[in-house]
Amino acid sequence: ISPFVDYITINISSPNTEGLRDLQKKGNIESLLETITKCNKKKLPTFIKISPDIDDNDLKNICKICIKENSISGLVISNTTISRESLYSKQIRNSWKIDEKGGLSGPPVKNLSNMIIEKVFKLTQGKILIIGVGGISTGKDAYEKISLGCNLVQIYTSLIYRGPGVVSNILSELSFLIKKNGYSNVTQLVGKKVKNV
């Protein structure tokens, strides 16, 4: 695939594939990364996509490995969540849907994703690349994720509900907020909201 991509993502966090999240655990992640290193002959930038529901010990271990291993470029934070906490405070027309299985994306994962981004930025002291995902539909959402430590952002749910025009809207608002807050470029914003790094 190397001629066709800028980077690859190893997804070890989809809640819809039974047992996949076990790859985030100590012991499993190390052997996976060893295999990735052997297979990545072209040295493509490689990211690991983690869960917003990840255990703190597993998160610390993954961060430690990412700093140590040259084969991993960074983390994609985060996949969908199995948590339904963000739904309980909302009035949902079909409340039975709260109990459905599968991962939630978009606004329901936003706060969890932001929390993990901030933790990873602190744990790695900003030494790895972070791609922020989850609940980005405005420039303000992107600004927040970047200020918590991510270097890049990805969108999906907002693209579905708002169409391709959402990209230019996000970029315009993000650019406005960066200038308004005294930054000359987006890289100056990375991790600015994170304390004690």
Name the predicted role of every residue range.
Residues 110, 172-197:
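Extended, intrinsically disordered, low-complexity segments
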Residues 39-51, 120-132:
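Short beta-strand/loop segments at the ligand-binding rim of alpha/beta enzyme cores
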Residues 12-25, 63, 67-68, 72-126:
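Glycine/Thr-rich beta-alpha phosphate-binding loop at enzyme active sites
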Residues 12, 73-82, 135-136, 142-169:
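Glycine-rich phosphate-binding active-site loops on the catalytic face of alpha/beta enzymes
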Residues 54-69, 121-126, 136-153:
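Catalytic cores of alpha/beta
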Residues 1-16:
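Internal alpha/beta core interface subdomains
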Residues 84-102, 146, 159-183:
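C-terminal helical cap(s) of enzyme catalytic domains, especially alpha/beta-barrels
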Residues 2, 26-37, 59-64, 117, ...:
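Generic structural signal for well-ordered alpha-helices
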